[in-house]
Structures are given as C-alpha cells and as structure tokens.
Amino acid sequence: MKFMIGCNYWASNAGTEMWRNWDEDAVREDLRVLSVNGVEYMRVFPNWRDFQPVMPVYTYHVQLVKYCLEGDRAPENPEYIDETMIARFRKFCDICEEFGIKLIVGILTGWMSGRAFIPSALFGKDLYTDPTALLFEQRFIRGMVTRLRDHKAIYAWDLGNECNCLGPTASDEVATNWAITVANAIRAYDNTRPVVSGMHALAPGKDNGNWTIAGQAEACDILTTHPYPYWAKFTDRDKIGSLRTAIHATCENKLYADLGQKPCLVEETGTMGPMLCDEERSAAFMRLNLLSNFVHGAAGVMWWCANEQTNLMSDPYTRQMVELELGMRREDGSPKPVLTETGRIASVIRSLEGRIPAAEEDAVCILTHDQEQWGVAYMTYGLAKQAGLNIRFAWCDDELPEANVYLMPSITGCYVMPRENYLKLISRVEQGATLYVSNNNGILAQFEDLTGLRVTEACIEQEVGTLTMDGRSFCFSRERRYETVSVGATVIATDNRGLPIISEYSKGKGKVIYANFPLEAALINRSNTFDSDEYLIYKRLFRDVIEAHEVTTDAAPIGITLHRDEKGDVICAAINYTYDAVNPEFKIADGYAIGEVLYGNVDTIGAFDGVIFKLTQKA
C-alpha cells in the first residue's frame, strides 16, 4: 500500500456549503496549489444534507403521507439523490484526476466541524437503528457508489466523517452492526476499493466505549485515527513542541493497527490553529508525523484541512472559532509552511518507499480491563520510546502475540484479563519470556507464585514517595499500597519505607518483573510528562533487550527503529520527538558502522525531524 500523503478538503470559497455554492474556478485553483506542494490524496465529503435532501410530507394529524426533495420537489430517482450534486461531485473528481489527486470519499457525511448535516426526513431518528434512517442510508450508499464507482480519481470509500458523533449508541453491538451494515452496502456496489472507517476515539475494549477498534476492524479494510492534541483524551497537557504531543499520532495509530490487525491511516491531524502554536511549529509537527508514521508502518498522514475558513459566514464557522484557521493555505491562497514542508517530506518518503522493511519490535504491551486503557498505552509508549524499547500493543481478551517480552502496565481492578490468557501468559514466562507488571490497585491471582513476593498488608492511601534503584532516586505515587516481603524475588528497588517496590523473580526459564506502583498511570495527568527521568526505570529493567540493538542512544528525545531485510541488512530510523535540535551520539554495535545516509544528519537531528541511514558490516 502506498503511503498516503494529503489533506481533508472543503473548497476555499464555501467550506461545508461547497456543493450548494459550487465554484469550479475556486476549486481548480485550490487543487492546483495543493497538488504542486505534494498533496496526493484528499478526503472529501458529499454533504449528506445536500446530496440526499429528502424531506417528509405530512397530512391530517401530522401523519406521514410521502417523501419528496427539499423545496417540495419530486424525487429524481429511487435513492432521493440530487442529480445536480452528483454532477458537481463528478466534475470535482475530473479536476482531481487532472491534478493526479486520489480521493477518499466520506459517504455518510452527516457530521462536520461541530454541526449535523442530515436530511430533514431523519431529524430526531436514531441513525444507527431506526428502520427509516437505515433505509435511506442504504439508498444513499447505492446511489452514490453506483453513480461514481467508475471514476478513476476515487481511491477508497469512507463510511463517513466521525459517524460515531451522530448520536448515542446503546451497546457496542449496535455500533458494530451499523458499521458492518454500511461497509457491506458499499461493497455490494463496489468491491474493488477499500472501505475506510472514518471514525475516531475508538476504545480498545467494550468496557471503555461502544465504538471499539475491534468493531471497526471487523467492518472496514483500513482503520483511521484523528489524533489532534487539542481534542484527544490526555493529549493536551504539554506544549506542541513536547515529546508527549509528538508521539501521540504514532502511538494511537499503532494501537489501532495492532489491536485491529488492519492498516491504519492518520486520517486527520493538525495543531488546531495559531492559538496553539505558530506556523513554523505546525509545519514541524506535520514533518514529524509524516516521518514517524512512515517508519512505523502507518497507511499515511492527512492534515486538517486544506484551506482557511475565516471568510465563511455559514454555520458552523459563525458559531465557533477553532475551525477557522486550520488550513494549509492562507485566505489569499498562498501556501503556509505546513503545505510546503508536506511537499518536501513527500519527496523524501517517495524516495524511500519500498526500501525500508517493517520496524522490528521488542515487546508486547498488553492492555487490560478496568484500567484507563488509552492513557496507560500512551504513557507506556512514551517511556518505552525514551528508553529505546519498541513495543506493539495487544488486548487482553485477544490471542496474545508470541514475544520474548511482555508488559502489563498499571493493572487496575479485579477483572484484569481472562484466566485462559493469564495462564497462557504464565506458561510463556515459564518457557523463557520476560513479564513486566506494574500495579495500579489491581489484583492478580497466584500473585506470590508469579512474583516471588508475599503481601503482608494492603491499604488505600494517597501516597507520594521516593524509590531508590541502583543508587538513583525516583518519585512515585500510588493509591493503594501493597506491603510485601520477598519469598524468592530479587529486590531491585525499595520505597522510602525500605519495602520492595521493584523486584525480579525467576520463573521457569523466564522472569517476572514487578513494580509495586503504577509507573505509567501516574503520568497520565501530569504536565511536562517526559521531562523527568522515569524512563530510566524502563532502561534499567529492559537493558538486555535494548543493549542488544545495533544502534542505541542515551538521548531520551530520540526514538530509534531498526528495519532488517531478508538478507539481514539493517536500516536505522531515528526520530527527534522534541522541538529542540539534538545530538544523538549514536552507539553502534561492534562489527557495524554507519553507512549511506538516506535522509537527515547523523550528527545533529533538527527539531521534530529525523535521520535514516544504513548500517554496514565491517570486514
């Protein structure tokens, strides 16, 4: 799959009203500027309100008598689709084809920028379960896909823009069934193109929401994330130029891809305008996300959005202010730095595409029940990146991937994971794997046998303390204290009471590392999250794995991935996840040397930038 580079598009002259206020000249100029600056893919939106303007007609006692089109027009076709809108959309596709732009079409665009755009016939209805709503959705899909499926500019069909914002759902079964129904309706009329999710804010498991990663993966061919630091949960604590913000999109996208076992596209991202950061940082933010997601195997990155919307006088632009200044182009049409930088990095990625194998992974991070799954995943990923450990994610209910190292960070509550998977995990430890567990008021069966520790007392207590490990002190916090003594475990660190807080226990051919505090969960709501040195705990606990890498660094902002081909040749990608230039001072394993530099500078990695180079084996 080609790495998708582009943006989300509404016309500069009209925004969400572009199909009603169609201006071919404005659209053509928009696309010309975008295409010459590296935009190869665009996500576009046939406004549902405009393309299927079906309205109800009532008679005596407000009884429904028939449906027609807005303005009391007779329907032009069985799908109640406005053929004028279809003609405009087809012309739009023609222009995109002229400029070499491929389209992801968000079919059921009933939600956009804080406003619902649905046909009046469906007002007040449950769009996921109501028979009338489902009927008109099926008709709309049939009408759109059959009329446009022959156009070469269309790359994929998207269920619609963030359709999980169209109303509440009673259960995950409702959400998943709706997504499968819509996706299969699309495939019924066009099975030659991928179906893209278009959703955001999905949950790893049912206990954190009805719209789940697994549900979308069951329905769609390509999953999507919309990782905005301003909007996403727990992502707005630090500056745009911070490591916490920088890893967000890569982490979330990898979480969805790993749990869903489907390609995942960063379908929308951006810095949300000049009140959050300046234009130079926005450009650097896009550069970083293109490079980082490319080397981590994402399906692509798309900016929100193409154009400024400060001159638009229609809702939602007149009702809220955050959507107005997000474009890659200014109001006068000139490119912002984010657009020109997108074009530059697009050229770099196209030169590397097909030459860089998948990144190697060191460990599996298992997310468990009852915890704040996204927050824990996010913080674990950040600590691991700083330490030099590359992780993938797994959900505790699913089949656990084979691995040499497992992490169960910040377990919470008493339902942690199904017993059958727990026993499989213990068996893998006995066969030689390493298991790391940190505790956030969680209960583990067979705790003593697993950890070599015995709990003597436990109590709820808001505790902030200091632990000592290898002569270095670290702050910790926890809400429940399990007081333990070793019954076979080696104590690596003690708390300020002198009690074991990090330990290691040999179990069969493997080992269990236990942290008696929620290292990861404690960081979720903390500002300047990764400016302190907690990552050194990971670096110490997993040092055998990390030090076995051909390339390492002590520079915490630098995340390294290694990419090995079938012949054993290695490419190293090093990304700087901060807005300060960093000297990585790479440590190269014996027998290797830095070879051809494919991108960047090995001596200094600029702000939100990277370096990619080959390793050569010494004779």
Task: Please tell me what each predicted stretch does.
Residues C7, L34, C96, M144, ...:
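Conserved, mostly hydrophobic/aromatic
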Residues D258-K262, G270-A619:
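Carbohydrate-binding surfaces of carbohydrate-active enzymes
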